[in-house]
Amino acid sequence: KDWINTICPKCNSQAKRETDTFDTFFESSWYFARFTDLNNDIAFSEKAAKYWLPVDQYIGGVEHAVLHLLYSRFFMKALNKINQIHIKEPFKSLKTQGMVCHRTFKNQNDQWLFPKEVYKENQDYFHMKSNEKVKSGRIEKMSKSKKNVIDPNTIIDNYGADTARFFILSDSPPERDMEWTESGVDGSWRFLNKFWNLINKEDLTKIEITNINPSNNKDLLLIKNTYKFVNQVTKSIENFHFNLAIAAIRSLFNEINNYQTVSTNCLIFKKFSISQLIILLSPICPHISEEAWSIIGNTNRLSEQKWPAIVTKYLQEDKLTIPIQVNGKKRAEIMVETDISKDEIKKLALSEKNIKKFVTQEPKKIIIVPNRIINIVI
C-alpha cells in the first residue's frame, strides 16, 4: 500500500500507482493451469495440473494461433524446464472457427446502416424509413463499426434459440466463414417446424419400444437407415463436421417422414427411429428436443439419455454398385448382391448393354476384386 499510494510528480496531489502493467498475453498464457484448481493461494496446483493437463481441445479464432497459443507454449516450456509443470505442450488439438459475416450497407451520405434499417426489393436495397436506395457493400466479418451486426435477441424473439444454433452449424464447416442471411435462418426455422409436426403427427405415448427386429423390407429399411444416419452423425460430430451432421439429421427426418405406418408394429419402429432422431438433434437444438422427448411419452430427461449405439449388422449393405472397366477404363456400373459368386458377376458384366459395345470378342482376362471392381481385358 505504501508503494501504491504516492504523490503525483506533476500536480503534487494524492495518486495511486498502476499495478496492472503486464501485457494481456502474458497474463492469459497459463490460465488453463490455474483453472485446474482454484481453491488455493498459489499459482497453480501441480497435482491438479498433472491430472487435467494438457488441454484436450482448444477452440478459438485463427488469430490465436500466432499470438496466444505461441506464448502459451513458451510458458509451458519454461515452467517445465524449472520443474514446475509436467507438460511441454499446453494443447493436444486446435480447432479454429470461422467468422460470422454479413453484407454491409451505406446510405447516400456514406454512413453505415444496420441490416434492420434496410429492406430488399428485387435486387436492390432501400432504407426502411426514407425509401432511398442504399449502397450495398461487401460481405464482411460482423463488426460494430460497420454496423453489419444482428442482435441475437431479435433472432431469439422471432425464431427461438434453437433456430439460431441450427442455422449457424448447418451453413458451412466450422473453420470457414459463414454469411448470416434471413433466408438461411428462415429455412432452419421451417425445418424445425416440420420436425415438430412429425413429433405430433401420431400419438406415440403408449407405444412401447420392445424388440427391434424387423421382419419385412419396409421396416428393415427404416431401421437400417436409422443406424446409418446415427453412424454418420456420430462421426461428423467427433470430427467437428457439424454441417454434415445436420445434413444426416435432415436425411433421417425424411426417411421417417416418408415411412408409412399401417400397424402397431410400424409405430414401434417409427417411435424407435424418432427417439434416435431426437437424441441426435439434442446437442444442436436442446430446447425443442427436450419437449419432443416428452411428447412421445418419455418421463425421464432427454439430457440423461445415452448417445445412440451403433449396431454394425444394420450398417452392412445387401447390395453394392460395382464399376466395370474395359482395359482399365470405366464403361458401366452394375448393382449386385454382396454375396454374389464370381461366375454370376462375370455373366452380369458381359451382358451389360454398354459393355457389349466394347467387348466384341472373347476377353483375354476378367479381373474381379470382390465387392470393389471388375476389369475386362480384351
Spans of model-derived segments:
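NTP/phosphate- and nucleic-acid-binding module
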Residues: 11, 22, 40-41, 212-215, ...
